[in-house]
């Protein structure tokens, strides 16, 4: 893993709605709770003790009822042990264990002080829509070459840290790719489709911060037109 801090300080300008007018309407869809290899590319809740498929997107960490500012940064750290991460974790932090590592996600200002661990990335600013409270969720995805997500939206920003492979994000205003060690983010309510390019299995951590009164995500009727390139 690179020791260089990856800092993403742009909001992915292609997400601005003035480029496309009003987005295609979203089709409300409840969060999936059943793990099934038949539908591996919709992020599903992992029930403790349940065996999950080899490939898919799995919601593995959550922090509810957060009182966040209108713009926050995602600080991602790794720790040598669960105990070490617990000692450094704030009340709003999220700890997950994937890819043989212990990951801690914290949210705050760009210069939020660190309390230990190895800082992997700082992603943001992530713009939040007004809400009484927000919920932050961490997902872990493992996708094969040419796999793709459903077309979907979120009521808040979505951000990624790519662990391995290359992923391509298609939106109404174009495409964007990220390789291992890189990050990307999009603004709320933007229709999108995520796919894997290249010959390597892609693994990533995903953050979605959404209105606590709304679902994790919703299916969208928007249809991608631009092609992803390897």
Predicted features and spans:
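N-terminal secretory signal peptides that target proteins for export/translocation
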Residues: 1-8
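Jelly-roll (double-stranded beta-helix
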Residues: 9-14, 19-161, 166-230
């Amino acid at each position: 893993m690179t020791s260089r801090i990856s800092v993403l300080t742009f909001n992915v300008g292609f997400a601005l709605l003035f480029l496309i007018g009003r987005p295609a309407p979203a089709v409300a869809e409840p969060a999936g709770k059943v793990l099934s290899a038949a539908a591996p590319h919709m992020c599903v809740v992992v029930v403790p003790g349940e065996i999950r498929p080899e490939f898919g997107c799995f919601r593995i960490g959550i922090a509810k009822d957060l009182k966040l500012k209108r713009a926050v940064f995602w600080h991602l750290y790794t720790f040598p042990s669960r105990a070490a991460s617990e000692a450094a974790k704030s009340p709003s932090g999220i700890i997950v264990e994937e890819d043989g590592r212990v990951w801690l996600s914290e949210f705050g200002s760009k210069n939020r002080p660190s309390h230990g661990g190895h800082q992997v990335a700082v992603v943001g600013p992530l713009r939040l829509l007004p809400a009484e409270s927000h919920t932050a969720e961490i997902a872990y995805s493992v996708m094969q070459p040419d796999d793709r997500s459903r077309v979907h939206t979120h009521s808040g920003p979505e951000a990624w840290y790519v662990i391995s492979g290359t992923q391509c994000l298609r939106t109404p205003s174009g495409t964007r790719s990220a390789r291992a060690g890189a990050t990307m983010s999009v603004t709320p309510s933007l229709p999108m489709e995520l796919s894997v390019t290249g010959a390597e299995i892609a693994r990533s951590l995903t953050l979605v911060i959404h209105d606590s009164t709304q679902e994790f995500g919703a299916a969208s009727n928007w249809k991608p037109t631009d092609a992803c390139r390897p």
